[in-house]
Amino acid sequence: MLYATQSGLSSEIKKIYRVSGFSLLELLLVVALIGILAAFAVPSYQTYLQKTRFMEVVQHTHAIRVAQSACLLQAGDSVSACDTFGELAMPEPLTSDNTQSIGVSATSGIITGTATAAAGNYTFTLSPIINSRGLLTYTVGGSCISAGFCKP
């Protein structure tokens, strides 16, 4: 049985109260550390989401590149023979939450994909080049390069 002494509570009761729970200072320190970590993590996560959304534009553009490459194999060296969706035998791509527009430039055959604001408003271009030996290559361009969303 525990009895109160004249100076207050007995030593056993003091020990019980001394070791229980976290202090307010410890809890504030943990909350501050979580806040600091979140301040660095949230902007990085937003950039990651934007890059992921922009990849939809890149995928649509590459799908048109495959169709254009097949068309150019049949048409020979004439890029202008493969510069519309009708000549590529494919429907025009639909817009989405991430893709504002996808198009093929007349006569030059440059494929351009434009992202929406959710994906950064960047552009991605693929320019077909047929060299003197008849080899087809594509040059990557657009505002996505300077933003680090795509590689040249």
Identify the residue ranges that each predicted region occupies.
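N-terminal leader/signal peptides at the extreme start of proteins
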Residues: 1-24
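Internal alpha-helical transmembrane segments of multi-pass membrane proteins, especially GPCRs
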Residues: 26-29, 50
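Alpha-helical hydrophobic helix detector
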Residues: 28-44
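Conserved alpha-helical elements of the SDR catalytic core
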Residues: 41, 48, 68
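Aliphatic-rich helix starts adjacent to a transmembrane/signal segment
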Residues: 44-61
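N-terminal alpha-helical signal peptides/signal-anchor transmembrane segments
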Residues: 57-76
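Periplasmic/extracellular, small/polar-rich flexible segments of pilin-like filament-forming proteins
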Residues: 72-152
